[in-house]
Amino acid sequence: MGFGTLVAIGVIVFAVVVITIILCLTCSCCCLYKACRRPQPVVTTTTATTVVHAPYPQQQGVPPSYPAAPYQGYQPVAIQPQPGMPVAPYPAQYPPPYPMQPPDPPAYHETVAAGAGAPYPISQPPYNPAYMDPQKPTY
């Protein structure tokens, strides 16, 4: 046997082993499939947290050095415009929406029917190779 034959046999054996493992892992009757698909035991640990709600110690009274009345709560105040700040009137009607895309240029048959003619000025002469400058000789 030559070296090339041994390499070919090795490649074939390797391919057969890989294909066999893939087929065995996908076939439900194979022992490798059952071993890989066996449900893993789920370990659950439960920890209980107990929260104790203790009331905050209340003050017995207002200290004598604090002459102000106790806080009575939030009193909302209407917002008034400041001088120098213009107040915009409420719009009676919303403006029309902007178009989503710019309009397309008119089709060719629409421009011809409207008499617009060519889209370029007619004063431009047509291309004429006779008017080209002769090539200058290179040195």
Curated annotation (Swiss-Prot):
<feature type="transmembrane region" description="Helical">
    <location>
        <begin position="3"/>
        <end position="23"/>
    </location>
</feature>
<comment type="similarity">
    <text>Belongs to the shisa family.</text>
</comment>
<dbReference type="GO" id="GO:0031965">
    <property type="term" value="C:nuclear membrane"/>
</dbReference>
<keyword id="KW-0256">Endoplasmic reticulum</keyword>
<protein>
    <recommendedName>
        <fullName>Protein shisa-5</fullName>
    </recommendedName>
</protein>
<dbReference type="GO" id="GO:0006915">
    <property type="term" value="P:apoptotic process"/>
</dbReference>
<comment type="function">
    <text>Can induce apoptosis in a caspase-dependent manner and plays a role in p53/TP53-dependent apoptosis.</text>
</comment>
<keyword id="KW-0812">Transmembrane</keyword>
<keyword id="KW-1133">Transmembrane helix</keyword>
<keyword id="KW-0539">Nucleus</keyword>
<dbReference type="GO" id="GO:0005789">
    <property type="term" value="C:endoplasmic reticulum membrane"/>
</dbReference>
<dbReference type="InterPro" id="IPR026910">
    <property type="entry name" value="Shisa"/>
</dbReference>
<keyword id="KW-0472">Membrane</keyword>
<keyword id="KW-0053">Apoptosis</keyword>
